Curated annotation (Swiss-Prot):
Gene from which the chain derives: folD
CDD domains xref list: NAD_bind_m-THF_DH_Cyclohyd
Pathway in which this enzyme or protein is active: One-carbon metabolism; tetrahydrofolate interconversion
InterPro entries associated with the record: Aminoacid_DH-like_N_sf (IPR046346), NAD(P)-bd_dom_sf (IPR036291), THF_DH/CycHdrlase (IPR000672), THF_DH/CycHdrlase_cat_dom (IPR020630), THF_DH/CycHdrlase_NAD-bd_dom (IPR020631)
UniProt cross-references to PANTHER family, sorted A to Z: C-1-TETRAHYDROFOLATE SYNTHASE, CYTOPLASMIC (PTHR48099:SF5), C-1-TETRAHYDROFOLATE SYNTHASE, CYTOPLASMIC-RELATED (PTHR48099)
Originating organism: Streptomyces coelicolor (strain ATCC BAA-471 / A3(2) / M145)
Reactions performed catalytically: (6R)-5,10-methylene-5,6,7,8-tetrahydrofolate + NADP(+) = (6R)-5,10-methenyltetrahydrofolate + NADPH; (6R)-5,10-methenyltetrahydrofolate + H2O = (6R)-10-formyltetrahydrofolate + H(+)
Molecular function GO terms recorded: methenyltetrahydrofolate cyclohydrolase activity; methylenetetrahydrofolate dehydrogenase (NADP+) activity
Protein name per its UniProtKB record: Bifunctional protein FolD
Length: 284
């Protein structure tokens, strides 16, 4: 068996096409969605990531609002930019690119953001709304994973899902999304400290690997016919980017998301979805 590819690039392109029509409809009503980004410092990886977000915006007609500060920016200077975007009616959603320079209180910065403009879906208030099953911007990567599974017809209802990872961006919120009544999956949350991880993986219909541990998920640990999504990012001794899933898993699983090219494009697409949905809510 060779797994079918869960193609995040193609699915993200389809989502962007749908968003283009929704943005055009908003503009006819006099509303232009705007994505703001706050970039502090000159880290090449962060610069590349933010530039990609603004290219995505241009493709669907979302306005770009870019705020860049030097690495020497103070806590007060960054907070001032956050307050400015909170008040700017042209900005319907924004992100603060992490990590911030050493000495900056990231949590304080994130808490200052207007929850309704939280394009990443990771504001403490919005994570709380997710726990309470109340409407709110959803975390981009977990929601992107769900969208990818749905678009390929992978059965989620009643599925046994193992989430490997416990980070705030994926591992923590992913089970909250999967156990909503609209999904009705049964979730086991594991991590690098889990005893006998293989025993859990072998029972899983869907594996979401987001631990940042190279090739943690091995072919012999995967149930034949499972769907396996590789969201982990780490580097080996030579500096090469590695995923959490061993390449041999593709010979056992029925579905697999490549890394890169699987979940990454979906994360960026869901960021745009959050911005457009915020604009639609404000338009009434």
């Amino acid at each position: 068996m060779t797994a079918q590819i869960l193609d995040g690039k193609a699915t993200a392109a389809a989502i962007k096409s749908e968003l283009t029509a929704r943005v055009a409809a908003l503009k006819e009503r006099g509303v232009t969605p705007g994505l703001g980004t706050v970039l502090v410092g000159d880290d090449p990886g962060s610069q590349k990531y933010v530039a990609g977000k603004h290219r995505d915006c241009a493709q669907v007609g979302i306005a770009s609002i870019q705020r860049e500060l030097p690495a020497t920016a103070t806590q007060e200077e960054i907070e001032a930019v956050v307050r400015e975007l909170n008040e700017d009616p042209a900005c319907t959603g924004y992100i603060v690119q992490l990590p911030l320079p050493r000495g900056i209180d990231e949590n304080r910065i994130l808490e200052l953001m207007d929850p309704d403009k939280d394009a990443d879906g990771l504001h403490p208030m919005n994570l709380g709304r997710l726990v309470l099953n109340e409407p709110a911007p959803l975390p981009c990567t977990p929601n992107g994973i769900l969208t990818l599974l749905r678009r390929y017809g992978v059965e989620i209802k009643g599925a046994e899902v193992v989430v490997v990872g416990r980070g705030v961006t994926i591992g923590r919120p992913m089970p909250l999304l999967l156990t909503r009544r609209s999904e009705n999956a049964t979730v086991t949350q594991c991590h690098t400290g889990t005893r006998d991880l293989a025993a859990h993986l072998k029972r899983a219909d869907i594996v979401i690997a987001a631990a940042g541990s190279p090739h943690l998920v091995r072919p012999e640990d995967v149930k034949p016919g499972a769907a396996v999504l590789d969201v982990g990012v780490s580097r080996n001794a030579e500096g090469k980017i590695m995923g959490d899933v061993h390449p041999g898993v593709a010979e056992v699983a029925a579905w697999i998301s490549p890394n890169p090219g699987g979940v990454g494009p979906m994360t960026r697409a869901q960021l745009l979805v959050n911005v457009v949905e915020a604009a639609e809510r404000s338009a009434g």
